[in-house]
Amino acid sequence: MLFRSVAVFNRTTARTQRLMERYAQEGTFVPSERLADFTASLRRPRVAVVMVQAGDATQAVIDQLADLLEPGDIVVDAGNTLYTDTRRREAALRERGLHLVGMGVSGGEEGALLGPSIMPGGSAHSYERLGPILESVAATAEDGTPCVTHVGPDGAGHFVKMVHNGIEYADMQLIAEAYDLLRRVGGLSVPEVAGVFRSWRGSELDS
C-alpha cells in the first residue's frame, strides 16, 4: 500500500468539513484546521500538494509551507502556474533544501474522482518518491498504462500543461466556429446543428 492516509487542509474550514462529509468513506483522511497541524501530520520526508489559484495565492501558500517544512521535503504545485514562476520558485526552494514539483493536472472535478492526466516536472529524485503514488491515482489509457510521466526538470510540468491548455482552447474555438458557420452560413436550426455534431461522434471529428 502506497499511503495509509491523506492529510487535508483548507484555509476555509467549512470546505474541509464538506469534503469529509462527502468523501470520508472513500479513504482515511486527516483534516487539519491549521497549516502547522497539517504539516506536522505528514510522514517524513513529507509531500505537500498545493492546489490553489495560480499567482499570488500559490506564492503565499508555498511561502508558508516552506517555513514549516524541512530539507528533503517535497512541495507539489498542482495548479495552473506559469512555468517561469515555477522555475523561479523551484530554484528558491532548492536553496533551502526543499524540492518543488510543478505538476500539470487535467481532468477537472471528474478527474479528481475518477483519475486525472498528470504532468509532473521537477527533479528525478522527486519523481522517484512521487511516481508510484501518482501512477496509482492517474487515469489509465486503453492499454492500462497510467496517464502520468515525468516530463522534465523545474517548470517542465507546467509548460506541458500550458501547451495542453492551448490545444484544448483551440479545439473549443474550432467547435464554436463550426457551430457559427452551420447556423449563419448553412442556415441550420439549433436541433439540426446538434444532429450534425452527434453524427461526428465516433469519427475523426469526435471531441
Summary of predicted features, one role per range:
Residues F9, S32-R34, M103, V151:
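Conserved beta-strand termini and adjacent loop/short-helix elements that scaffold enzyme active sites
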Residues S5-A7:
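Short beta-strand element of Class I
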Residues S41-A54, G187-G202:
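N-terminal-biased segments
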Residues T58-D63, L82-A194, G202-S207:
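Rossmann-fold dinucleotide-binding core
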Residues R11, R15, L19-R88, A92-L98, ...:
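Rossmann-like NAD(P)-binding element
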